[in-house]
Amino acid sequence: MKNIGYYNGETGLLEDLKVPFLDRVSFYGDGVYDATMALDGVVVFAEDHIDRFFNSCANMEIDPGIGREELQHLLTDLVAKVDGSYHFVYWQVTRGTAHRSHPFPEGNANLWVMVEPEEKNLQPAPIQLLTVEDTRFFHCNTKTLNLLPNVVAAQHAKEAGCEEAVFIRDGFVTECAHSNIHILKDGVFVTHQADNLILPGIARKHIIASCERLGVPVEERPFTKTELMDADEVIVSASVSYTHLRAHETLMN
């Protein structure tokens, strides 16, 4: 298949599937998600992403109606049905289908999955970053579907000719619109600590582990916009891109 979608047990091409009008995602963005890549049929860091997904579910008090192992098998099975060897894998759960009312409805959650082929980008290239004010809410560690501030920031970056937007909160760098950001200065890897102001990125986790294996000092702490501008290197990381780390970024105020 050229792509595949899944909704509560029904599968088909993404352009053919339909979801109920009363799915709570329509009214409230009431759900959580996660995403990664698959390479040669293997969902990359699947356990890490699934653990984070279930943590998001717990934070938002959503029962996904599926277990970890069952979800991992489902993702792997769907990947196997799509053409190509490199895929974008996305899944989300919403808090069911019901007439619009703020309190939680009775009934089961809705599980969505989509898998699409992607092209590998293995060529290193510099990217440009735009700094923007971080006005998001204080639950950035939960991967909810409420992404409007990220969407607007990403659009402003695009309009400025940049590939990513960097959030600045009270003078400190938090993360980007859809990735984590880190700096290298005097041989030290510096990254914002994993608290409620950033998403605990899976790529970030494995970069930190690699630094520890290689003997590179790691500081998990807030760093300022000035430190960002003065860094020896800026590293942007995300699980849904597969490329060499870029050793040079241009930053725009």
Regions found by a protein language model. Give the residues of each.
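Helix-start/capping segments and mature chain N-termini
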Residues: 1-77, 94, 99-246, 251
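Phosphate/pyrophosphate-binding loops at sites that engage ATP/ADP/AMP, CoA/4′-phosphopantetheine
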Residues: 79-82
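Ordered, amphipathic secondary-structure segments that act as subunit-interaction surfaces
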Residues: 84-91
